[in-house]
Amino acid sequence: MEEPTVQFSDEDLVDNFPPMDDERVQLEDLEFEVERPSEGLEDEGSHSSAKKESKGAEKMRKSTTKDQVQAFHLRKSLNLLDKMHEEKDVFIQKTKGELHICRQRMDLLNKQQESLAAEIATEKEANNMAAIGRLQAASRRLQTELENEKDLQSKITAMLKDSENAMWHIEIQKGQFEDVRKHHEAEAEARQRGLEVHSARQLQREREAMEKSEKNRLLRARKSLHTQKELGLRHQKLVEDAQRNHRIAVKFLKASLGRVREREQKEEMESRTHMQRRMDAVLSLKNNITASRETLKKFQAWGQTRADLAKQKALTEKEVILSQGGDAFKYLFHQRRHQELEAQKRAFEEEQKLRKQEIVNRILKEEAEEEQRKRRQHPLSKPINRRTLRDKTWQYISDFCEGKSVLTSQQERERELLLYPKTVCVIKAISSESVQVDLGSISTEDEVLAEPDISGLWNKESYQVPKEDMERKPVGGSKMEKDILARTMEQLRSGVVQKQVVSGREFKGRPFNSKPEVIHFKDFDIGKVYKKKITLINATYTINYCKLVGVEENLKDFIHIDFEPPGPMSAGMSCEVLVTFKPMINKDLEGNVSFLAQTGSFSVPLKCSTKKCSLSLDKELIDFGTYVVGETTSRIITLTNVGGLGTKFKFLPDSEFYEMDESQPAMKISSLFTCEEKIIYEKIMTSLSEQQLEVNDSSLVDLQSLKESEKQLDDPEVTTAAVSAMTMIPSEEQAEITLGEVTEGEIGPFSSVKVPITFTPVIPGEVQTKFKVMFKNPQSPPLYFRATGTAIDVPVWVPKATVDLKICMYDRLYQDSITVHTRSKAALRLKFEVCKELRGHIELLPETGYIQAQSTYSVQLKFLPRQSLPEDARKYFDPASRVLEAPMTIRVADQIKPVRFTVQAIVTTSDLEINPSEINFGYCTIYEAIRTEICLSNLSLLPQEFGFVGLPKYVDIQPNDGFGTILPLETLHLDVIFQPIKAKEYKFELVCKSEINRCFKVSCQAVGVHPPLELSHYQIKFSATSLYDTSVSTLYVINSHLSMNKMIHSLPRIGSEEAAPVGPTSFEFLLPPNSPITISPSVGTVLPGKRCLIQVAFQPVLPKEIIYKEASQILNKEIETKPVSQKEIVQRKELWKQSFSVVRVHNRDRPTRVSTPQATELQRPVINSSSTEFQIAQATLSKAFQGKFNRFVIPCVVASGDIKDRKTAEPLSFSPHNTLYLELWCPAVAPFIVVTSHKGKTDFNFGDIAVGHRSVKKITLQNICNEDLTLEYSVLNPNGPFVRLNPFNKLRSGETQTLVLSFSPHENILAQETLDIITKRGTLSLTLFGMGVASMITCSIDGNILNMGYVLARESVSTNFKLQNESSLPIKFWVRLESLSRKKAEAHQQLPKFITSHEQRAEIVGTQNYNGQSVFSIVPVEGLMFPGKAQEFTVTFSPDHESLFFSDLLKVVLFEKKVSHQILLKGAAREHMMFVEGGDPLDVPVESLAVVTAFDTEHKEEAEELKPILVTLNYVQLDTDTTTSPATRELQVGCIRTTQPSPRRPDHPLMVSTLLQLRGDVKETYKVTFVAHVVTGL
């Protein structure tokens, strides 16, 4: 806040002021002022001599310079004073503000002190000592703050006073320099006026120079124009010659091309026909293959489904049986056995069928051979009792099925030759297909052949009783034996109730004792026969009898008793009974063998038990005792099987679950199919194979593979596993008591297996583990045992069993400390060992040491991984994961188990890889930058910081200027941007340093190019442009190369090559094909020091391919939805008839497939850019357009020279290195306003409209953007034919409005205009065009007057004329007569014409008929004239009385408004055929309204009066000396052609007589005869 006050003197202000920045400007002004007196001396021109003038000027220049220097220093002093005055003023204002704030704070503190004093008084009254202390402390703090504020106020006040004093001193000094200031201001104004005068003179000189240059330019332009005209004439001549030669060449070329096209079309048609046939064949083959594969897939899926269903059914049955408590394994075994037997039976039947077919085929073949052989022999007599082929076949089949010997074909032929010599059998040939079909339908069981009435009549051999039947006894014995048995049984029955009393004692109990007491067949096998003898001992007191009763019902199928009754048996005597057991099922059987004795019945128990497992362990507890941690011991446990059935076993811990695999017997997959299904399947497969053989050999592979799969499925060795073994769940912790190597296997009957149990203590303490033995046999329950042991700990241990060094880099040292503990009460010697492979990388220090009792010992671990670590420690190092696990050993004296720990580390490299290692930027201009991408890869597992250092100023690396952190195994993509500053060759290196100061280099090279031309802009960003709208931007191509002096500016060159010459330089922009960019001009020449304006236009459009695709879809929909017209149906019928007739002609010889695509599909119209579908598709796609952004880089090649100087075919030598690039950003968006009417078209054709008429079109516009738009319209030509009828200025979002436009041509012209609808989001251009057609009609009447001539009254005459339509529009016309117009009624209101008639007629409509009808009529009165056609009109003249003044006006009106032609119709009527005209008129030219009465035809000539003709001849002779011409008048005598019959003969001329009365001096009467011949009708 302190501002020191400094006093300045005048000398200090003048001398010690630092120099200002405007010294240069002041010196320039000084030079101007020095030159000004010399100019004034020149203007005065009144000096005596040049010497005096120069001396005075030199003296004045010296004095002026001194004054200017002094004034300059004074000006600097004044500026310094002004600056100091401003600073002091600001500082004073700031100090005053701080003083005001300080006073406000003091007032606030005073108020707070007063409030605190009041609160202290209040608390004192309340005797609140705590509050009083707190308030007093606050009061003291406020007092301190108030004192500080007072000190601050005094300081600020002193500072303010000093500042004001300094301010006053500065103002006093400024007052002293006030006169100097005013003087300098006056000088500045004078200097400014001088500058303005100088500027005006300079401007005048520049204008004169400009006018002179403009004249020179006009002169050069005239000369250039003259030269261009000469060149144009010469060029036109050359073009005409070239065109003439071209026409001659084209004539011959067309002829040659025509022949070539005909030949190519012929070849193309042949190739198309051939290709069509091949395509049809391929499609047919493909369809057949697809159908076959689908069928095979269905059958495979069918078989798989049935197999799954069968498996599911088996599992369900197993669960049901288990839930019911039954034996599921036995049930499934029997079921599978049954299925196996059924499958074998079906397989045997199928084999029999195949054998039958094979035999039949063989017999047929032999018969065919025999028939051929016998045909070559002479015919023999009729065979006697010859067996047919059918008999022999079935005889052979029956013999084969019964197992008899079958004769071979050769033996059969020999036998036939012996039995039937010289016999021939004519056998009808049977195809193999019919034989197969018959055999497929024959069943050996269902076929019933014809049999004779007497059995054995047809048999050739007598029946022989088989040996088995002879040896077989009848069931139940012979008749005699049955009688004996009946008597014996009767005796036995009668003696059952007999009591045996001997010596007074009655026998009670079992009469016979059996040895053994129980008949037990153990461990039997199905199919084998077991026999046992039992001895029956008479246990009664006297003689007894024994008779076999039998066995129980459930044992009769398996037990056979051989017992011959011994007769009476004394007491103690015995007899033997042979019991035979033949098991058929694997099932336990129990029952009794019953006997009958004289004293009663008794029985011997019978048991049949299957093979079973009887398993046991020799011990249930294994006690290992006490062992030290690390030692290993083992015990043996024995598993014994005393049963007759072996099984598989597995020892496992009690905590684990394991289910033994149950092997299922072989089951054929084919058993899943029934016989009927298999027959159907075989038939389908046979048909498929036949089709495939006809189509292609490739399908044989599929069928072969299918058959192989069937064989594999039918193979009995293929079995399905019922239950898969579950995997054992490993224990998370390592078990101390484990099983040995033998944990599972198979134990046979009556054998034993020994299994070792191992105890390896790891943790001190008591260990107990339970085990169980699982068996595959479900009837054998698991066995359990347990093992116990006690472990004691070692005295030395390491707390950290694993030393984790984390991630380490090669060639860097890492250290850690390892602590060893002991619980021993004595000192122990320790030795630290590192494995041999890692001794060059890991070191433990010290290697040997002593650890004291119950203490710790530290060892230092040093790890320095070398690059050879992966090769040295292959056993401990994983190259894939880069993990090192090195075991370390601590050997302790008197301790068996060494202490081990592991050193674990992830070893990684510190390399950074840069790809590519060499960069060649190529040629690069100084106006552009080349960007290339490099990949920086971190091969380490640790993140590393990197940075590119020491970069040249023309190289940049992005992002982040080439600095950053790269993550482990990450690859960063960096952009190296090279922009040369001048043209030369560049070679440099990019250095990348890591955080550990490792350097990685990339070598770079490039060539800098300075092009002769440059662009004003190298990048253009267009605004968002709607589809079919245009955005335009401008730039300049500048030629700044003016001199070859390299000291002035850098010369354009390529690298170190020679500089480009000074002169006109040409350029050309190379646009990519099909781009929406237009550059105008794209080619040009720029003179040195000049620039050329370039316009770049961007007009986004939709690709035509997409539009054509959308248009074709629209056309297809229209064709599908369009109903078929009757014409198309008739056309299709005709085409079908034609194609059918062609097929019928070809089918006379063989069937031929004829393709007639015209009959099935009509030819579709061709879509072009002017079609309706194309425009609809374009509008639809424009609405759905989502926007697109394109970036174009347009190259601009540069060449030295002028384009005009080059020859016609010689291109300029453009260098590829002197290429400029223009970057364009082109965003395209959907249009914001679209046309919804006229199918979205923006081109509106009003068509051909007649001149003077108007056509109106309504255009519907819709705003499809999300905001309201204000519309502006471009100005249409005010004198043009197009007019906007209802312009609207606003279109809301989604709103639709209608714009009405009209087209009214004023002349015959093709009109086209563009109406731009302008919004802030874009412009919609509507193209309007129409043709104004003038109604050009020509009339065949010359002069527009049609004179009908003379007609006899009450007759009519007609004549024709034509109107020709010369325009391109059909014209509607109306023909109107003036006498029939509406204006006639107005004419009736006026005075009659004969009253106001003049000497000459002035009316168009003359005399009319008396009967009210028009005297003139015309046909037709209206119609339509087509373009180029003529319309013929017939005009009829029908007068009803005599008059010479018939007239009317005929008007041809076009389009009800325009009068095209006016034809005056005239005619005259006479009562007689002959008439005379001429002379002076004797009546008025208009007839009276009175009607002259008509006379009869007979008396007409008598009643008529002769009408005189007044001919006045005026002869005036003014001078008698001269002869004058006589007075003449002309009279016309006419004859009218009539259709009335004439009474005179035609060979006599018609005589006309008249009387001439001459009035004057001579009165004579002459008779004059006029002869008139009718030459033409008038």
Swiss-Prot record:
<dbReference type="Pfam" id="PF24798">
    <property type="entry name" value="Ig-CFAP74_4th"/>
</dbReference>
<dbReference type="InterPro" id="IPR056310">
    <property type="entry name" value="Ig-CFAP74_4th"/>
</dbReference>
<feature type="coiled-coil region">
    <location>
        <begin position="330"/>
        <end position="378"/>
    </location>
</feature>
<dbReference type="GO" id="GO:0005930">
    <property type="term" value="C:axoneme"/>
</dbReference>
<keyword id="KW-0966">Cell projection</keyword>
<keyword id="KW-0963">Cytoplasm</keyword>
<dbReference type="Pfam" id="PF24771">
    <property type="entry name" value="Ig_CFAP74_1st"/>
</dbReference>
<dbReference type="InterPro" id="IPR056306">
    <property type="entry name" value="Ig-CFAP74_2nd"/>
</dbReference>
<feature type="compositionally biased region" description="Basic and acidic residues">
    <location>
        <begin position="33"/>
        <end position="65"/>
    </location>
</feature>
<dbReference type="InterPro" id="IPR013783">
    <property type="entry name" value="Ig-like_fold"/>
</dbReference>
<feature type="region of interest" description="Disordered">
    <location>
        <begin position="33"/>
        <end position="67"/>
    </location>
</feature>
<feature type="compositionally biased region" description="Acidic residues">
    <location>
        <begin position="1"/>
        <end position="14"/>
    </location>
</feature>
<feature type="region of interest" description="Disordered">
    <location>
        <begin position="1"/>
        <end position="21"/>
    </location>
</feature>
<dbReference type="InterPro" id="IPR056307">
    <property type="entry name" value="Ig-CFAP74_3rd"/>
</dbReference>
<protein>
    <recommendedName>
        <fullName>Cilia- and flagella-associated protein 74</fullName>
    </recommendedName>
</protein>
<keyword id="KW-0206">Cytoskeleton</keyword>
<comment type="function">
    <text>As part of the central apparatus of the cilium axoneme may play a role in cilium movement. May play an important role in sperm architecture and function.</text>
</comment>
<keyword id="KW-0175">Coiled coil</keyword>
<dbReference type="Pfam" id="PF24778">
    <property type="entry name" value="Ig-CFAP74_3rd"/>
</dbReference>
<dbReference type="GO" id="GO:0035082">
    <property type="term" value="P:axoneme assembly"/>
</dbReference>
<feature type="coiled-coil region">
    <location>
        <begin position="103"/>
        <end position="156"/>
    </location>
</feature>
<keyword id="KW-0282">Flagellum</keyword>
<keyword id="KW-0969">Cilium</keyword>
<comment type="similarity">
    <text>Belongs to the CFAP74 family.</text>
</comment>
<dbReference type="Pfam" id="PF24770">
    <property type="entry name" value="Ig-CFAP74_2"/>
</dbReference>
<dbReference type="GO" id="GO:0036126">
    <property type="term" value="C:sperm flagellum"/>
</dbReference>
